[in-house]
Amino acid sequence: MEGEGLLVRKIRSGVVIDHIPPGRAFTMLKALGLLPPRGYRWRIAVVINAESSKLGRKDILKIEGYKPRQRDLEVLGIIAPGATFNVIEDYKVVEKVKLKLPEESQGVLRCPNPTCITRKEREKAVSKMVLVSQDPPAYRCVYCGTTVMGDEIHDLISP
């Protein structure tokens, strides 16, 4: 295609997240705690609604200098299962992971039930959710049985 090329330059080190469903890039940045003011520590490129042969449209994130944590893969898998998470070092991809919904999530998703033991300040119970459906995505709290589905899940990600 004429005029096709890089929208954003390559990064020396950090992460590139590709094949994000359109409209979810900022949800990912928020969940990672990378929106301002904390986000000013890294150079972040956000591409919204780019053309994609696989998805039709997609979002892309490039975060230069960011060192991913294991929790990040779990959080991002909840937001955008199927997206590709690339770790970059010296301009090369050194690790590539296809994000997926975690089978179990401990301390990442908050139970929305106000009477759940994990919501009580006096209790030390950490939230624990198990995947009960891939499509649509759904998680169930192991303590109270509350089930959450779809985009509602994104609102329950703990900071």
Swiss-Prot record:
It comes from the Archaea. GO terms for biological process: 'de novo' pyrimidine nucleobase biosynthetic process; pyrimidine nucleotide biosynthetic process. GO terms for molecular function: metal ion binding. InterPro entries: Asp_carbamoyltransf_reg_N, Asp_carbamoylTrfase_reg, Asp_carbamoyltrfase_reg_C, Asp_carbatrfase_reg_C_sf, Asp_carbatrfase_reg_N_sf. Pfam families: PyrI, PyrI_C. Zn(2+) binds at C111, C116, C141, C144. Keywords: Metal-binding, Pyrimidine biosynthesis, Zinc. The keyword Metal-binding applies. One of its GO terms (cellular component) is aspartate carbamoyltransferase complex. Its cofactor is Zn(2+). Signal peptide: none annotated. Binds 1 zinc ion per subunit. Contains catalytic and regulatory chains. Belongs to the PyrI family. PANTHER family: ASPARTATE CARBAMOYLTRANSFERASE REGULATORY CHAIN. Involved in allosteric regulation of aspartate carbamoyltransferase. This is Aspartate carbamoyltransferase regulatory chain. It comes from Aeropyrum pernix (strain ATCC 700893 / DSM 11879 / JCM 9820 / NBRC 100138 / K1).
